[in-house]
Amino acid sequence: MRYMLLIHQGDTPTPGSEAWDRLSEDEQRAVYAAYGSINQTAGVTPGVRMEPPELATTVRVEDGRTLTTDGPFVAVKEALGGYLFLEADDLDAAIELASRIPAARMGGGIEIRPIVGS
């Protein structure tokens, strides 16, 4: 079964943020190592880390006109910060991997979505 794991940042410290700067160098290295390990896990297709939602542009088409708005589509506390794809035997395996993602234990959450037709 294929899953998409959506990494919602919440209060997770991310590189470049004040919260990240408050982490010790050992804590920062541990976060990078955890993501590196996850990306090397069999069945994982790594995604990418995204810029903060304030840098988003939302596009809508109304009456044939393209409208753009600076910022995310909706204001949410746990903005989408990244994603990855996983080929796993079952949901339990996806949950196990999600529990290893640093954001899950540092103030964020991981949403697991099955891929249609997988």
Residue positions per predicted region:
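Conserved, structured core segments of small domains
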Residues: M1-S118
